[in-house]
Amino acid sequence: MEIKNIKEFEKASKKLQKDTLKIALALLFLIGAALLALIFGQANSKGLLLIFAAVIGGYMAMNIGANDVSNNVGPAVGSKAISMGGAILIAAICEMLGAIIAGGEVVSTIKGRIVSPEFINDAHIFINVMLASLLSGALWLHVATLIGAPVSTSHSVVGGIMGAGMAAAGMVAVNWHFLSGIVASWVISPLMGALIAMFFLMLIKKTIAYKEDKKSAALKVVPYLVALMSLTFSWYLIVKVLKRLYALNFEIQLACGCILALLIFILFKRFVLKKAPQLENSHESINELFNVPLIFAAALLSFAHGANDVANAIGPLAAISQTLEDANSPIGNTLSSVPLWIMVVGAAGIALGLSLYGPKLIKTVGSEITELDKMQAFCIALSAVITVLLASQLGLPVSSTHIVVGAVFGVGFLRERLREQSRRRFARIRDNIVAAHFGEDLEEIEGFLERFDKANLKEKSLMLESLKKSKNTAIALELKKKEKKSLKKVYKEEVIKRSILKKIVTAWLVTVPVSALLGALLFVALGFIEKYF
C-alpha cells in the first residue's frame, strides 16, 4: 500500500513539474512579447497600452496553437502516419513559416465587417473594443482547450468584437447580415466536410478495399488520388496564401496546379512501383501507401493555417498598434502593413501553444472522435482542402475547424452505417445458415452464430481463425465454404467506436455567444478600470 502511494506521489510530482515548466515557458514568451512591443513599438505616450495589447495578442496566439492546429495534424497522428512529436515539430515549423512568409498581407480589421464604422469613431473606444475582443476570444479558446473541444478561432474573435461593439455602441452597430453568414457556417462547414470525406472513403473502399486483389487496385488508384490531392493543395495555396505574394489569374492558377499534379503523379507512381514487391494483399499493407501523402498534407495544412489564422491574433493587435501610432488615421478601416515584431509574436505564439498544449486536442481530433486508419485520414485531409477551396470560390462562409471535425464525424458516421449494414447482412446470413441445416448439430451452430454476433472485432477474428483450423468439429463440417466466407466479410466490415459529437457541437454553438458575453463584460471592465484607477 505504501509503495503504491509513493508511486502515485511520484507520478503527481512529475506532472506538477511538467505543468510548472509549461507555465514558466508561456510566461517567458509573454514577457518576450512585451519586450518586443517596448523596443519596436512606436506608440508614443501610449507605450504601456501597446505592451498590454502585445501580451494579450501573444496569449491569443498561444491559444490558437493549442486548440486550432489540432485539425491539421490530428488525423495523421490518429492514423499513426506520424508520431505526436514529429507532428508537433512539423506543424510548429510550418505554422511559423506560413505566418511570417504569407501572413503579413495588408490587414483590414475585422471591426469594419462586424460593427459599422460610423458607430465607433473614437480611437479610445476602438482600442478598448479590440482589447476586449482579443482577451475574450483567448479566454474562450483556453476553456475550450481545457474541456477538449476544437472550436473556431475566427468565431471566437468575431463573438468578442460583436459583444464589445454592442457594449460600446448598442445592438444597432452590429452587422447582423455578416453574422448570419457565421451562423450559416455552423451547418455548411461540417456538412460539406463530412459529405466530401464520405464520398472519397466510399470511393477508396469500392476501388481498393473491397477488391479481392487489393494490391493491384491500390497500385493503380492511389497515384491518381495523390495527384488529386496535389492539385487541390497547390490550387488552395495559390488561391488562399500565395496570392498575397503574387496575384495570378484563374487560368494560370489552374495550369500551375495541373502541372504540379502531373509531376507528383509521375513521382508517386514510381514510388509505389518501387514499393510494390514489399506490399502484401492486405488492408494494413495498402494503408502504408498513404503515409507520405499524409505527412505532406499535415505540413501544407499547417502552413496555410499559419498564413490565414495568425490574423486572428495579430489583426486586432496590428489595428491597436496603428491607432496608437497615428491618432489621425481613420478608425478601424485603415489598411496597414503588419510590423514584423507583431508577426513574430503571432507566429511564435502559435508554435509555442501547439508545442505546450496541443497534444490534448490532437488526440481528440485524431483518435477520440473515431478510430482512423491512413486511408480514412487521407480522405479527411483531402476533404478539408477541397471544401475550403470550393467554399472560397462560391463565396460560402466556412470554418476550417468545423470542416475537419465534420469530416472526421462523416467518416465515423459512414463506418457506423457500414456496421449497421453488416449486422443486417449477418442476420440474413444467419437465417440462411439455420434454415439450411436441420441436423443434430443445429443447436451448436446457432450457439456459434450467437457468440459471433455478440463478439467484438478481435474475438470475431479469433473465432474465424479457430473455425478455419478446426476441420473436424461439427460446426466446421456443417458450415459450407460460402457461408464461412460470408461470416468473414461481416467481421471485416464491422467497426465499433463511440463519438464525442454532443460536446463538440455544443461548444461550436456557444462559441459566438460566450465570446460576445465575455467581450461585453471585458469592455465594461476596461472602462471601469480606466475611470477609477
Swiss-Prot record:
Protein name (record): Putative phosphate permease HP_1491
Family designation: Belongs to the inorganic phosphate transporter (PiT) (TC 2.A.20) family.
Protein purpose: Potential transporter for phosphate.
GO BP: phosphate ion transmembrane transport
Membrane topology: Multi-pass membrane protein
Subcellular location per the Swiss-Prot or TrEMBL entry: Cell membrane
Alphabetically ordered keywords of this record: Cell membrane, Membrane, Phosphate transport, Transmembrane, Transmembrane helix, Transport
GO molecular function: phosphate transmembrane transporter activity
UniProt KW Transmembrane helix keyword: yes
Stretches that traverse the bilayer: 23-43, 47-67, 81-101, 129-149, 156-176, 182-202, 221-241, 248-268, 286-306, 338-358, 372-392, 509-529
InterPro entries to which the protein is assigned, alphabetical: Phos_transporter (IPR001204)
A GO CC term attached to the entry: plasma membrane
